[in-house]
Curated annotation (Swiss-Prot):
Protein name (record): Deoxyguanosine kinase, mitochondrial
UniProtKB keywords: ATP-binding, Cytoplasm, Kinase, Mitochondrion, Nucleotide-binding, Transferase, Transit peptide
Sequence positions that bind ATP: 45-53, 206-208, 254-256
List of residues binding substrate: E70, Y100, Q111, R118, R142, D147, E211
Subunit structure: Homodimer.
Active-site feature positions: E141 (proton acceptor)
Length: 277
């Protein structure tokens, strides 16, 4: 719990401005409970399932929506705090690559960073244009919830996180999410579904350096985690509100990147889903 309090102080420090707190904390919480404010969606899916392509399609179809992409560049280039004499920051390493190369050593560190970066994104103030819009939408590429119930959970189950690391992670994860509960509420999940084999093919095609050591077995594990949560409903969730969030399942087995007809179908399903939220 001490770790949770320390992280909480750091987060609160980033939102210290009285004006910002007045705009973000109470009104945002009231808006969420009153049914007002932006609809908050999260896109979930396996590694290389096509989330980035889908996000670009969403942004093209709905330029009025605010879309927050996954902060991969931050994970690939960890910078030391404070500037050096020349005004630059010291580069500490590529944590994404380090995690894949030595999962037993770096998984806890990586999951701490990934959770904190997602949390900060989801806590960012609502832009004025969204507050003024009649029907505004915020979209997040993955969430603080999948960080725990998909990725960290899987790393624990495959032995990359120790018992004590998993216990500590869950402790401060629960503490922080309870502390910021009103500001992290989601109205819907969009689950992009494809087989591990399809994801493996797309992973090879995008040829990201850090992912060259990923094996099919790992994608199969993550696929099972997604299916257990979004399809089979067997994942034990510790936040009651999360258990009732609607899920739109989109089959993205077929490559839709240059298929206009399939793109139209997918966006039609999204629009129908949004109307029912």
């Amino acid at each position: 719990m001490a770790a949770g309090r320390f992280l909480l102080r750091r987060l609160r420090a980033s939102f210290r401005s009285p004006l910002r707190n007045a705009l973000v904390d109470a009104p945002h919480a009231r808006a969420m409970h009153d049914g007002g404010g932006p609809r908050r969606l999260c896109i979930e899916g396996n590694i290389a399932v096509g989330k980035s392509t889908f996000v670009k399609l969403l942004m093209k179809t709905h330029p009025e929506w605010q879309v927050a992409t996954e902060p991969i560049a931050e994970w690939q280039n960890i910078q030391a705090a404070g500037a050096q004499k020349d005004g630059t920051s010291k580069r500490l390493g590529n944590l994404l690559e380090m995690m894949y190369q030595e999962p037993a050593r770096w998984s806890y560190t990586f999951q701490t960073l990934s959770f904190m970066s997602r949390l900060k994104v989801q806590l960012e103030p609502i832009p004025g244009r969204l507050l003024q819009a009649e029907k505004s939408v915020r979209v997040f590429e993955r969430s603080v919830y999948s960080d725990r119930y998909i990725f960290a959970k899987n790393l624990f189950e495959n032995g990359s996180l120790s018992d004590i690391e998993w216990h500590i992670y869950q402790d401060w994860h629960s503490f922080l999410l309870q502390e910021f509960a009103n500001r992290l509420l989601l109205h819907g999940f969009i689950y992009l579904q494809a087989s591990p084999q399809v994801c493996m093919e797309r992973l090879y095609q995008r040829d990201r350096e850090e992912e060259k050591g990923i094996e099919l077995a790992y994608l199969q594990q993550l696929h099972s985690q997604h299916e257990d949560w979004f399809i089979n409903k067997t994942t034990k969730l510790h936040f009651e509100a999360l258990q009732h969030v609607p899920v739109l399942v989109l089959d993205v087995t077929e490559d839709f990147s240059e298929n206009a007809a399939r793109q139209e179908e997918l966006m039609g399903q999204v629009n129908t889903f949004m109307r029912n939220l």
